[in-house]
Amino acid sequence: MRHFLDFEKPVAELEAKIEELRRMTDPGELNIAEEVTLLSDKAERQLRTLYGRLSPWQKTQVARHPERPKARDVIAGLITEFTPLAGDRGFGEDAAIVAGPGRFKGEPVMVIAIEKGWDLESRLKHNFGSPRPEGYRKARRLIEMAGRFGLPVLSFVDTSGAYPGVDAEARGQAEAIARGIDACLAAPVPFIATIIGEGGSGGAIAIAAADTVLMFEHAIYSVISPEGCAAILWEDRANAAQAAEAMKITAQDLKRLGIIDRIVPEPLGGAHRDPQAAITALGAAIAETLPGLAALAPEALRAKRREKFLAIGQTLPV
């Protein structure tokens, strides 16, 4: 059964009526096929209208949709011969970061991804997509490995933020994130990052300081969650919608501000309605971007990458 968001109620009612008609075994005088077609067209128009004017808070809900494709789906759809590697060679393993070598369209790459999980058991295993220090150190280790072996890096980001627990802080969470960003900037190979759902704070940028940052049409990318921002500025998480509007967290705003480089279109109604179509569109965007980066020398890649991130915000009005 499809999960509908609050603002999708008109579409939910239409689709429920369509399903009811399709289940009818004795249509009587009703022309079921014609009625279903009319209602389907109406539902599509309603969906197009709704998704053509989503607010930042509504986009946040879409980015968090439980049926939205996760990192495992993207990897399964785009990467062959994927071999996940474990451990930071210092403390332990963190399943929130799923990473290892594989092939993209037949060519070897290094994949770094943050996995939220898709049911209760997997969400607990992957810590709801909030990496600990050992996860970021594993990512750094594999980015450095990619540099040694000349493998382009593809990262897929979906996290509300790094794990903020006391144990993570005790093991150097801030240092792990900072060194992760440094490893991204220093990588002598092409690096493409994609925000596939949520991109939350330093926990996201630790694997997203890339040559090219792609972002799904209804994903979000911000320094803090809207609820967290509202709790700080208004001391009330109920102001999350207002915070989302103020923070400019949508792909459209971030493209305009120069934070991301390209928006990957989603199927009508969001990636959760047709995950395979969304993943195919992402694969096409990566395939179009990678050759241009692969043509650059390592020093040119590093220089352009650093220049890109140092330039962010310099031309914005204060």
From Swiss-Prot:
Annotated InterPro entries: Acetyl_CoA_COase_a_su (IPR001095), ClpP/crotonase-like_dom_sf (IPR029045), COA_CT_C (IPR011763)
Q: What is its EC number?
A: 2.1.3.15
The record's catalysed reaction(s) read: N(6)-carboxybiotinyl-L-lysyl-[protein] + acetyl-CoA = N(6)-biotinyl-L-lysyl-[protein] + malonyl-CoA
Alphabetized UniProt keyword annotations? ATP-binding, Cytoplasm, Fatty acid biosynthesis, Fatty acid metabolism, Lipid biosynthesis, Lipid metabolism, Nucleotide-binding, Transferase
**GO CC annotations, alphabetized:** acetyl-CoA carboxylase complex
Task: Name any Gene Ontology BP term.
Answer: malonyl-CoA biosynthetic process
One Pfam family from the record: ACCA
Q: What does this protein do?
A: Component of the acetyl coenzyme A carboxylase (ACC) complex. First, biotin carboxylase catalyzes the carboxylation of biotin on its carrier protein (BCCP) and then the CO(2) group is transferred by the carboxyltransferase to acetyl-CoA to form malonyl-CoA.
Which family does the record claim for this protein?
A: Belongs to the AccA family.
What the entry lists under NCBIfam families is as follows: accA, AccA_sub, PRK05724.1
Matches recorded under PANTHER family: ACETYL-COENZYME A CARBOXYLASE CARBOXYL TRANSFERASE SUBUNIT ALPHA (PTHR42853), ACETYL-COENZYME A CARBOXYLASE CARBOXYL TRANSFERASE SUBUNIT ALPHA, CHLOROPLASTIC (PTHR42853:SF3)
- Protein name per UniProt: Acetyl-coenzyme A carboxylase carboxyl transferase subunit alpha
Organism listed in the record: Acidiphilium cryptum (strain JF-5)
